[in-house]
Amino acid sequence: MKNTEKISPSEKIRQKLQEEKILEKISYSDFVKICLEFVEYFIFPLSNRELGSYIDYSKDFLWEKIDENKIYKYQNEAFKDYLNLSEQLEKSIQDVVCLCLNYKFLTSYYSEWTVESKNPIWFKSITHYTLDSAPTFLHYIGDIDGKLCGDFYEYLKVYIKNK
């Protein structure tokens, strides 16, 4: 039986990043900075709203100008703004904004599903999820426009080449 399931643009690019080990060539903090730049230059122009302050909050957090409590406050404001949006494009852009204000996205390293035994006889295990930054970012930008995933891939490659 032939597999006819279509692979999403975000999944295609995730696979390329994994195969080419691109994310292993940069630090996590560089990855986050690249994501923020990409959002600012490629995604915000697609919106009818002024969104620059959101990225400024993320940068201020990275540069330790604001603390964890402030970034949570700004993320909550972004979620509230999302609830007032009606256009799907604006909602998808706001999803990216919320991700860029996410404390774990701004601070955590790439991680995946992990299963930990909470029972000494391994009878029962509990699955924990920690934000897996690269696939999540690709998924959200792919929801705006699948072409953005390829653009991000190229943007990353240029960054690494010029590093």
Give names to the regions the model predicted.
Residues 1-163:
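Structured binding/interaction patches within domain cores
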